[in-house]
Regions:
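A cross-family signal for N-terminal binding/gating loops and helix N-caps
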Residues: 20-51, 250
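Conserved phosphate-binding loops in nucleotide/dinucleotide-binding enzymes
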Residues: 45-49, 55-65, 309
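Positively charged, Gly/Ser-enriched RNA/tRNA-binding surfaces
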Residues: 4-17, 27-30, 38, 58-60, ...
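Internal, well-ordered alpha-helical segments in soluble enzyme and binding-protein domains
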Residues: 131, 156-159, 175-178, 190, ...
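Glycine-rich, mobile lid/loop segments that gate access to catalytic sites or pores
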Residues: 151-168
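Acidic, His- and aromatic-enriched active-site or binding-groove loops in soluble protein domains
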Residues: 41-55, 167-201, 289-291
Length: 447
């Protein structure tokens, strides 16, 4: 199932012009720590002879396993900037490692699937619409395997920051981190944290929560609700705080309206979306599945303007990431998907005796040359055992070479036959022209 999901995502990403890359698994501590408060997630590496002496080396100089694919991307872009065409659109599907406590939906080692667009100097806002639509399109393809409909919930950091500053709050990053916990711990606990850790009054905390309650499906509705909230809390329209918030509001309204014109209902404005990591500077996204509230977000990301730079040149970007292993786990255990094939082969060529194996291999090679995935029985066991072997691997067809009929005492020479072991149908077949049923041959493979 995981491989089929990977293939589906890759197909959609490449249809939209994204280029696949792979980066090394190991990065320096300095690179890994660029993303903010992530030290607890990093697995550091040591040579055996260094065990017990790790403290002699600063964390920034040590090596660690990457915990996401954005930090390696920023290094890759800087190192290869002279050879890349910007904006650089990349997809990457690779394993990452995090210091998680293993539990359902949380893994220490898992596969992540990312798409990002990186600009040189600047990056047009329209990519902030394009990327969530690409992800929605990819997730829509996975509905064939039981995944529910996905909706992207978007916000903009500038909108939130301007509003918080308009209230008189100064610890904007702290407020964003606490608001990011809203779905996990609830409004009362977030309000308490805002007052205790961010210096907010009870009235300011309530206003922050009121902002987080705002949702809208179009730009006009969003602007009307936001302006009413600003007026209620005394944030005037000619203030610097409102001007900053309005920049974010205009971008968010553009995203929602343009997404609605292309794929209605795929993206909504949801002002509780905060994304706790410090490096996001504009749009932020979380993606939720219909009827799967307990699962939480399955795809997240946002705009970052300051993650990568080279001298005076900055490389702003926008990206989205799917925790693919977590998504596949949900599909297998909750969404009703199932992996009914272990082998990618569509055909198993039977072997009646070892003297006939060369003939079986020739048939297999002719089928493979025509693009039909084929395996050959490992031993010349009884026919029933060979069919059971194919069934255990989920191989839907068993090919009987002509030598089967010829080897039977008193039988006339006959042509090859192929049996669909799912339906029981058995027909004459020629390996130069026979085609498997595409539905049967392409059923889900790879657990």
């Amino acid at each position: 199932m995981e491989q089929r999901v990977i293939d589906t995502l890759r197909k959609v990403f490449e249809l939209n012009g994204f280029i696949g890359i792979e980066t090394r698994a190991v990065e320096t501590g300095a690179s890994l720590l660029k993303k903010g408060e992530t030290s607890k997630e990093i697995y550091l590496l040591s040579r055996l002879q260094e065990v017990g002496h790790e403290s002699d080396t600063p964390i920034e100089e040590r090596l660690g396993l990457h915990f996401d694919l954005t930090v390696p991307l920023s290094r890759y872009v800087v190192e290869h900037s002279g050879a890349l065409a910007f904006p650089f659109k990349r997809w990457q599907i690779q394993k990452v490692w995090r210091g998680e406590r293993p539990q359902e939906g949380r893994f220490r080692e898992f596969v992540q699937a990312d798409i990002d667009v990186i600009g040189a100097g600047d990056l047009p806002d329209h990519y902030e619409v394009e990327l969530p639509l690409v992800m929605v399109s990819a997730l829509e393809e996975l509905r064939a395997y039981g995944l529910p409909k996905a909706t992207v919930h978007a916000n903009n950091r500038k909108l939130s920051e301007g509003f918080y500053r308009g209230l008189g709050l100064t610890d904007v990053e702290g407020v964003l981190r606490e608001i990011d916990k809203l779905d996990k711990i609830g409004a009362d606990e977030v309000a308490r944290l805002l007052t205790e850790t961010c210096g907010a009054t009870e009235a300011q905390a309530r206003a922050c929560l009121e902002l987080a309650e705002l949702t809208a499906s179009d730009g006009a509705e969003l602007a009307a609700k936001f302006d009413a909230l600003c007026e209620a809390h005394g944030i005037v329209k000619d203030s610097e705080a409102y001007t900053l918030a309005r920049q974010g509001l205009d971008t968010l309204a553009m995203i929602v309206d343009e997404a609605a014109a292309i794929r209605p209902g795929s993206v909504i404005a949801d002002l509780k979306i905060a994304r706790g990591l410090d490096y996001y500077t504009g749009s932020v996204y979380e993606t939720f599945l219909d009827g799967a509230a307990s699962l939480g977000s399955i795809c997240s990301g946002g705009r970052y303007d300051n993650l990568a730079s080279q001298g005076n040149r900055k490389y702003p970007g926008v990206g989205l990431s799917i925790g693919l292993s977590r998504l596949v786990s949900y599909m297998l255990h909750t969404a009703g998907a199932h992996a009914n094939r272990v082998s990618p082969a569509a055909v198993l060529v039977a072997v009646w005796n070892e003297e006939d194996r060369p003939a079986a291999n020739r048939i297999a090679n002719q089928l493979r040359a025509r693009g039909i995935a084929t395996d050959v029985a490992p031993t010349a066991a009884k026919l029933g055992k060979q069919i059971k072997y194919a069934d255990k691997l989920g191989i839907p067809y068993v090919w009987f070479p002509a030598t089967a009929a010829e080897s039977a005492e008193g039988a006339e020479p006959a042509g090859d036959e192929v049996k669909n072991i799912v339906t029981g149908e058995q027909v004459a077949a020629d390996c130069t022209s026979w085609e498997p049923d595409t539905v049967v041959a392409q059923q889900t493979v790879e657990i």
